[in-house]
Amino acid sequence: MALPSPASEEAEGPCQEANQEYQEPVCSPVPEPEPEPEPEPEPDPEPVPVPPPEPQPEPEPQPLPDPAPLPELGFEAEPVQEPEPTPTVETRGTARGFQPPEGGFGWIVVFAATWCNGSIFGIHNSVGILYSMLLEEEKEKNRQVEFQAAWVGALAMGMIFFCSPIVSIFTDRLGCRITATTGAAVAFIGLHTSSFTSSLSLRYFTYGILFGCGCSFAFQPSLVILGHYFQRRLGLANGVVSAGSSIFSMSFPFLIKMLGDKIKLAQTFQVLSTFMFVLTLLSLTYRPLLPSSQDTPSKRGAHTLRQRFLVQFRKYFNMRVFRQRTYRIWAFGIAAAALGYFVPYVHLMKYVEDKFKEIKETWVLLVCIGATSGLGRLVSGHISDSIPGLKKIYLQVLSFLLLGLMSMMIPLCRDFGGLIVVCLFLGLCDGFFITIMAPIAFELVGPMQASQAIGYLLGMMALPMIAGPPIAGLLRNCFGDYHVAFYFAGVPPIIGAVILFFVPLMHQRMFKKEQRDSSKDKMLSHDPDPNGELLPGSPTPEEPI
């Protein structure tokens, strides 16, 4: 409104001159034709410049286009909105946009996984028969060979657990098919070469190391690949694999005993190696539907080979799970129990042959262990689902207590029927202990770190599991019988059960302490009022004065 005022003053000047010139001719009518000053009102068009000041206020609204770039700044946020990376992530292995076929070719994969589990653990659970055959060969060279011969089967079983963290890395990097096929081929080579040597030290390497490591690399991918083909029916697929492998492995004690009676140990190794050869072919069916994970995000952030190595090392060897005190105690308790866990599998057959010489069907005991172990795996899964939180550990406590007591009961059995009852409980405890291991790991460290927690746990179990059978064999050499050896085998599981008993109590105590600390933090986390603290009893801060 103030801007047009200078223009109005400029307009008044010419108007006054025009009025003065016009008043003079009013007295004389002659100058009427002098309208020529009227053209001078043409300066009136000069008011036409008056609008130019009006555009001057218009430039002020023109800053309004300047805010218009602000949406452009907001528009630059669209790169965050880029959904292009998400399709690449979904196609690269995350299960978000992936729907398994829930059958079809997946049932062939289930059969391959069943063959894998059944053949591997059928041979390892029948190691007691192989141990007796090995002693018969070595007795001619050395009368006190129980300690040395026990290392063969113990090494093979221990390597399955010892290689677990490494196998998970290879499975993630190379995929299930390559890892499983390579592992089955190594297991075949280990078993087949064991038939060409009679040296105990060489069989430490061929059977204990090669066969054991190959079984570890072939076994874990058989469990991972099921998630590529099943999601809604994954429980059914796992149940078929567990039940099928249990039935499959129950036939191995009878088969190995029959082969041992008709042919020698070397030819028995050759026959068993054919199962690994078939497993090598079946592992080729592990066609991954979810590609193996790649490290492109890591490569973007790591420019040197050393940085990439550190990124991968921290990714695969994450030691944060050991910061959980309850996990450390739980892992230590299970590792302690593993010292006596594998002793009955190795020495039971030889003990029965020495004590019950009239019994020829000693392999029935291993069949009983395999049958109830499969039953325990099926039943314990349903029972653990109904038990909330870390109270599942009490199932492991009970299974370890029974396992220790049953191991101590073996020398006290006076007849073969009592041994059958003991073996039935041994297999049941084995099934309960193994099945609920993963759910407990999820409760302790969460789903993001559960796989690493299980891998570290299996690795910790390897050393005591390897050492247990040789120590029992050494005790047999020292005392002349297996009584002390089986008493020794029962002590570590009982100690492990006592340790595990305190894990839920400690976890609950730590949880309550965290709740108290968090409640204190919430009480102290209110923003202070400008005038000071809250008035006692007032729900709101004191208003500023």
Swiss-Prot record:
Tagged with keyword Membrane: yes
Membrane topology category: Multi-pass membrane protein
N-acetylalanine modification, residue list: A2
Region (2 X 22 AA approximate tandem repeats): 29-72
Region (Disordered): 1-98, 514-545
Sequence intervals crossing the membrane: 103-123, 150-170, 178-198, 207-227, 236-256, 265-285, 329-349, 363-383, 393-413, 416-436, 454-474, 484-504
Reactions this protein catalyses: 3,3',5-triiodo-L-thyronine(out) = 3,3',5-triiodo-L-thyronine(in); 3,3',5'-triiodo-L-thyronine(out) = 3,3',5'-triiodo-L-thyronine(in); L-thyroxine(out) = L-thyroxine(in); 3,3'-diiodo-L-thyronine(out) = 3,3'-diiodo-L-thyronine(in)
Cytoplasmic topology ranges: 2-102, 171-177, 228-235, 286-328, 384-392, 437-453, 505-545
One Gene Ontology biological process: amino acid metabolic process
Tissue: Expressed in cerebral microvessels.
Knockout-associated phenotype: Deficient mice display abnormal thyroid hormone metabolism with no apparent neurological phenotype.
Modified residues (Phosphothreonine): T540
Biased composition (Pro residues): 46-70
Annotated Gene3D superfamilies: MFS general substrate transporter like domains
Residue ranges with Basic and acidic residues bias: 514-529
Main location class: membrane
GO terms of molecular function: amino acid transmembrane transporter activity; identical protein binding; thyroid hormone transmembrane transporter activity
Extracellular side: 124-149, 199-206, 257-264, 350-362, 414-415, 475-483
Its biological purpose: Specific thyroid hormone transmembrane transporter, that mediates both uptake and efflux of thyroid hormones across the cell membrane independently of pH or a Na(+) gradient. Major substrates are the iodothyronines T3 and T4 and to a lesser extent rT3 and 3,3-diiodothyronine (3,3'-T2). Acts as an important mediator of thyroid hormone transport, especially T3, through the blood-brain barrier.
Binding partners and assembly: Monomer. Homodimer. Homooligomer.
Annotated protein name in UniProt: Monocarboxylate transporter 8
